[in-house]
């Protein structure tokens, strides 16, 4: 923790004991949550950002959901469905749902949403997640979705990725980028009542919401997402009683706040913290095209020490054997990572022609800066003269896509769709591919055609082994979400996801939780 934050903690400690705004806000049933990196839209398609996702996954609804605890698909906007063939699915929709603006939900909304997603003119990130569908209206509340070709994770994609928009609102907009900025209309248990880059985001629980199951709970009447990008200011506001819940807090800061009476809650998140190494030579610095240099980088990192010291909730964080977790569907690598061995790392650098070491810029999305600094400190010991370069999300995404990174630290919310097919698409798809390994691309394509999960898992084994053997990606750790809250607030386990936090999981301490039954 920085001395500045320590100073704030020391000066403001009394404020935690004296503050009354928290209790006052509870009486108003308004839960105030800090937003670390304010998003430009409440939109799952134009702004697919992890922190924004914790909000929009409770604002929007899918055709169906997947209950990870009971390993089954459950109804949402669709009350039933059937597989007609390996390319055709049919859905019967509920007829008692209205959007937050009062418009009735029907088949037209699904068709309008899916047609927009697959339109060549629609420019969004991760376009290939959505353009495989061909929707057809069979009746007012019945649709057919045909895939362009057999797609083994079609149901999973629909359950995790496809948020249905209001067709009437879509037709009224000349620019669909405005949907999440000016008209974030949806069908979820919370609705947007105010959205401003400075004031933040205010949501309100929908009265008499159509989904009465525990999957769509809204524990607080109102939720105010307050944008505060600076950690020092976040801590000060929390201690002054102006914020009820901090998200993604550094371990040392959480420990100090916990000692003052705050509630510290590490929550499994299955966010994959990783380092990508530019084996394809896309960046100007070509050092990572040499497999020996990549191995030296990895073998210089004492993973267990870094995870337990710098990763929030590191004592319980999963250290995955590859680019996927135990809960990830079809994840079965049988070749492990290169072990920590700094002496061997030095030797490999010398063999690669760098007896005097080598210069390296380690780029990082700003929230993971502390961990990147820890990694840099270790690899410097074996000869990597490393400069850490943190940046905002927008800059990070653009520079990554432009192929400017030699080595970079990032994290990916695998729980957004915990399937190996999704992870291979994320790392090796579009402009995110820093390896250009045709074998991995071929295996991913074969996996998309295999509907048997066990067989699909076996198909992926050579690809996962190749990633580890060639030292393409170093999976550092799970990155749990470390929440710090007042004693009036608690963080619940999500009723659908075993490793994801959403808005309906933040509740007052006296909230009575009801879990879904089998």
What residue ranges belong to the model's regions?
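Extracellular/periplasmic solute-recognition and catalytic clefts
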Residues: 117, 134-137, 193-204, 226-284, ...
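Alpha-helical secondary-structure segments
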Residues: 32, 106-115, 140-146, 188-189, ...
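N-terminal lobe/hinge region of extracytoplasmic solute-binding protein
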Residues: 34-85, 115, 185
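Structural transition elements
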Residues: 190, 284, 315-351, 370
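Detector for C-terminal structural segments
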Residues: 39, 196-200, 205, 273, ...
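Surface-exposed binding/hinge segments that line
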Residues: 25-26, 82, 126-170, 194-196
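Gly/Pro-rich hinge or "lid" segments in bacterial periplasmic/extracellular proteins
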Residues: 67-68, 72, 159-218, 222-224, ...
């Amino acid at each position: 923790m920085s001395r500045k934050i320590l100073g704030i903690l020391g000066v403001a400690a009394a404020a935690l004991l004296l503050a009354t705004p928290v209790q006052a806000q509870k009486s108003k049933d308004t839960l105030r949550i800090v937003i670390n990196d304010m998003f430009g839209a409440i939109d799952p398609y134009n702004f697919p950002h992890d922190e924004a996702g914790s909000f929009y996954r409770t604002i929007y609804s899918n055709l169906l959901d997947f209950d990870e605890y009971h390993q089954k698909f459950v109804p949402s906007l669709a009350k039933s469905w059937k597989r007609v063939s390996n390319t055709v699915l049919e859905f019967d929709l509920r007829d008692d749902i209205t959007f937050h603006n009062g418009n009735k939900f029907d088949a037209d909304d699904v068709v309008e949403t899916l047609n927009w997603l697959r339109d060549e003119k629609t420019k969004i990130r991760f376009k290939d997640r959505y353009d495989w569908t061909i929707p057809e209206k069979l009746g007012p509340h019945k649709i057919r979705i045909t895939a362009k070709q057999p797609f083994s994770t079609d149901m999973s994609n629909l359950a995790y990725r496809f948020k249905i928009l209001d067709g009437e609102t879509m037709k009224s907009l000349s620019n669909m980028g405005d949907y999440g900025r000016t008209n974030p209309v949806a069908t979820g248990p919370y609705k947007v009542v105010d959205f401003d880059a400075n004031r933040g985001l205010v949501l309100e629980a929908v009265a008499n919401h159509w989904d009465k199951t525990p999957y769509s709970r809204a524990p607080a009447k109102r939720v105010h997402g307050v944008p505060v990008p600076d950690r020092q200011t976040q801590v000060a506001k929390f201690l002054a009683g102006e914020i009820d819940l901090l998200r993604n807090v550094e371990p040392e800061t959480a420990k100090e706040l916990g000692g003052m009476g705050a509630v510290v809650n590490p929550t499994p998140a299955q966010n994959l913290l990783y380092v990508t190494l530019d084996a394809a030579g896309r960046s100007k610095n070509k050092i990572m095209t040499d497999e020996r240099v990549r191995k030296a980088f990895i073998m210089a990192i004492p993973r267990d020490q870094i995870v337990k010291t710098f990763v929030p909730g590191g004592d319980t964080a999963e250290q995955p054997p590859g680019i996927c977790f135990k809960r990830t569907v079809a994840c079965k690598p049988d070749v492990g990572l290169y072990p920590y061995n700094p002496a061997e790392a030095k030797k490999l650098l010398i063999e690669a022609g760098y007896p005097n070491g080598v210069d390296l810029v380690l780029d990082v999305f700003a929230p993971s800066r502390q961990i990147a600094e820890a990694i840099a400190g270790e690899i410097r010991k074996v000869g990597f003269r490393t400069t850490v370069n943190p940046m905002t999300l927008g800059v990070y995404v653009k520079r990554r896509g432009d192929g400017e990174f030699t080595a970079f630290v990032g994290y990916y919310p695998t729980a957004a769709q915990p399937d190996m097919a999704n992870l291979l698409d994320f790392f090796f798809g579009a402009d995110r591919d820093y390896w250009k390994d045709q074998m991995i691309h071929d295996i991913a394509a074969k996996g998309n055609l295999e509907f048997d999960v066990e067989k699909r898992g076996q198909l992926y084994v050579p690809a996962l082994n190749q990633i580890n053997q060639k030292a393409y990606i170093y999976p550092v750790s799970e990155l749990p979400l470390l929440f710090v809250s007042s004693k009036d607030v608690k963080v619940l386990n999500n009723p659908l996801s075993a490793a994801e936090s959403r808005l309906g999981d933040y509740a007052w301490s006296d909230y009575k939780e009801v879990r879904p039954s089998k």
